[in-house]
Amino acid sequence: MTDNSNIPDGFKASGVSITGLRKSYGSNEVLKGIDLVVKPGEVVCLIGPSGSGKSTLLRCVNLLEQPNGGTIHVGGFETTDPDVDLDKMRQKVGMVFQQFNLFPHLTVTENCTVAQTKVLKRQASQAKEVAQKNLTHVGLADFGDRYPDELSGGQQQRVAIARALSMDPTLMLFDEPTSALDPETVGEVLAIMRSLAKAGMTMLVVTHEMSFAKEVADRVIFMDGGVVVEEGPAKDVIGNPQQPRTQDFLKRVLDPTHVQIAE
């Protein structure tokens, strides 16, 4: 759990406030009036079945998807304001995707410096120093000259985290960061996320890793059908869910032998 009263100076944490968020693709309404608050320094995990709107919600926060209604505030920015400075807002929001999204033609260090020099206008030497600090943090201090295809999936995802951290974000978004990994590399990525949570980084995480959510999250939100079905402290939502739909989902996830196949 994070200690929200003791956020290090290195992390100027941003909160998130979402009100009445709606998103449709044609006639298919994916998000149906979502209300959500993430306090500075808080870790919130979004869980639920595929197609419930979790990833769409995450992508709406930094406007990778354009909402159809509602408001989103991140730190001092109203991201849904037509006049918002998107570049400045996105500098403060780091995002880690399922599929790493590293530049294959750039080295590990270059992947971590290119946005620093182009967006933050840092000198190359400073950008490299920041990149090295974050690569060290994720356990890849000696991998700077390698290319993505020379790394395992877990190592690539750790580079993606270092790249995001190199932009000095005040909020980190994780969209199922372990779903594309081999089982033996999942733990190394989750360990980095645990360290960020412990250090006070604000995190909004879409995950199917229930043990991670129960251990690290301050709150868990269960979504289904584009709405929030249940939310609360992680130990309550995962350990003692109150809503039948949440109970059924967790029973299937935590005990796959429960699932019955229709004949």
Name these PLM-found stretches.
Residues 11-234:
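ABC family nucleotide-binding domain
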